[in-house]
C-alpha cells in the first residue's frame, strides 16, 4: 500500500477494506517443529534414555562404611570380624599372693613376740581392756594405779565416748608420772612410771597386734 493511498483512506477518500497493514500480514518464520501449548519438553524423551539425576549409576560400588575392627571385605562377600591379638596376662598365683599379704600379726616372728613379753620384762604384765562406754574408765584407772601397763582398745566405742576416755587416760598418766602413747588407730598404751617403753617396743606392739587376741 502506497503512502498516498494510506492518506486517502485516513480522510475517507478511499475504502477501508483496501487498507492493509503489513503488521498483521507479517508472520514470523516458523522455527523448528511445532510444539503444543504448555509443552514441558518431556514428551521428546524415551523412558529408557531418561537419566534421573537422583539415581546412582548401577555399576557404582556401594559407599564404604566404617571398617574399624573388620577385615577387608569383597564387593558382595560377608563381613568377617578381625581377630585381635590379646596379650597374655599372667595369673596371680595363690602362694605368692599369700606370701605378699602376710603382714601385721602374721608377719611377726612368734619367738620375738614371746621374748618381748617373757617373765621379767616390763611388758610381761601388760593387759588389754576394751571398754564399751565411758563407765569403764574406773577399771582402766585401777589397773594403771596398780602399776600394770594397760592397752586401751577403743575400736568398738563411738568417737564421742572414745575422746572422753582418751582425755581421762592422758590426765591419769600425767598425774601418776606415767606415759600415754598411741599404738594404732583408736588403740593406746598406758605405761606406769617404772615401766619404760621404747619406741621400738611400741612399734612391735603395733606390728604384732597381740592385744587383739587377749
Curated annotation (Swiss-Prot):
Keywords: Cell cycle, Cell division, Cytoplasm, Septation. Residues 23-70 are annotated as: Disordered. The keyword Cytoplasm applies. It is found in: Cytoplasm. GO terms for cellular component: cytoplasm. Belongs to the SepF family. This is Cell division protein SepF.
